[in-house]
A protein has these predicted regions:
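Accessory RNA-recognition modules of RNA-modification enzymes
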Residues: 1-185
């Protein structure tokens, strides 16, 4: 890793400096604070996961060791809602379908959670989903709909609408408080 960092500092940053050492995180699992899960219908059911290597085929993954355990609970809840309400997954090849991605963020210090649904239009019976999610965890502070109608593999569009709760979640990093939206890096 040290060599990779040094090479990238030189090649990409134009900096001729040496990284002294890489300090590993003591937390090997559950350290990610953001996940973007593409949607797909697999065996007749809504599933979220990650793209298989070098493809846009979704490999279902309810629980990823890099994400906190509660992300899996949110994934399962949204899958159940979609199956119970006939919500279709967007298909990049045909341009048809409603739900494109499930996007989850959390603030590590604040404990606040943002759930963002990326869809091509309005989600039917979304009030039911809001009740399911907010009944599941009091840490969910924001549920947002991002409408992305474009024929693109870019996940988010500029059109975000808060369905429930706050527009952003907050977190503290290095003593500074940040407001985090779905479109934050």
């Amino acid at each position: 890793k040290k060599n990779t960092v040094n090479e990238n500092l030189k090649r990409l940053g134009g900096l001729d400096i040496e990284c002294e050492k890489i300090i590993p995180s003591p937390q090997e699992n559950g350290y990610r604070n953001k996940a973007q899960y593409p949607a797909a219908i697999i065996d007749g059911k809504m599933r979220f996961g990650f793209y298989s290597r070098h493809s846009h085929r979704v490999a279902p993954c309810e629980k990823c060791p890099l994400q906190p355990d509660f992300y899996a609970d949110i994934v399962i809840t949204v899958e159940k809602f979609c199956d119970d309400n006939g919500i279709t997954a967007y298909d990049e090849e045909t341009g048809k379908g409603l739900l494109r991605h499930l996007y989850i963020r959390d603030g590590r210090k604040s404990g606040e959670v943002l759930v963002c649904l990326v869809a091509t239009g309005e989600i039917p019976n979304v009030g039911r989903l809001i009740k399911m999610l907010t009944g599941q965890s009091e840490n969910i502070k924001s549920i947002v709909l991002n409408i992305n109608k474009k024929d693109t593999n870019v996940i988010l569009s500029s059109e975000c609408r808060t369905l429930w709760g706050k527009d952003t979640i907050s977190d503290i990093l290095c003593g500074l408080e940040f407001e985090i939206s779905p479109r934050s890096f």
